[in-house]
Amino acid sequence: MKIVLVNPEIPHNTGAIGRTCVALDLELILIKPLGFSIDDTSVARAGTRYWKYVNISQYEDWNDFINTRKPPIEDIFLFEEIGQTSFYDAPYTKNSYLIFGSESTGLPQDILAETPDRIFALPMKNSKVKSLNLSNAATAAVYQALKVHW
């Protein structure tokens, strides 16, 4: 299982997600452009002393990622507020790619349009809240996915 961040903007979120990846022995995949330098001290600070243990891969853009990794469609899980299916009902696989967009704009529309049936949402009880912090959403999703395969 892998966590994929497409164009992350806030280093603290990426650092926190990196720490989660270390705790769960998952790969963290970053798709450029990034809103910070991967060597940024704020990324390492959020990941604390664990950042050096993050299994991290980077790709120049979405096409580079898709063409290099060639993930099967059944392993792709896009997380976005417009998802019609709850992340509780997603058919996770052991090789799932849990994919999240940037903090300000989410996943690009062209990515969402490629696989509209692979978009999942974290349910919100209160309609005043449309999304969660990226690191919180990624952590919630990965623990839900691992629940199926733990």
Residue map of PLM features:
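Post-transcriptional modification and biogenesis factors for structured RNAs
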Residues: M1-W150
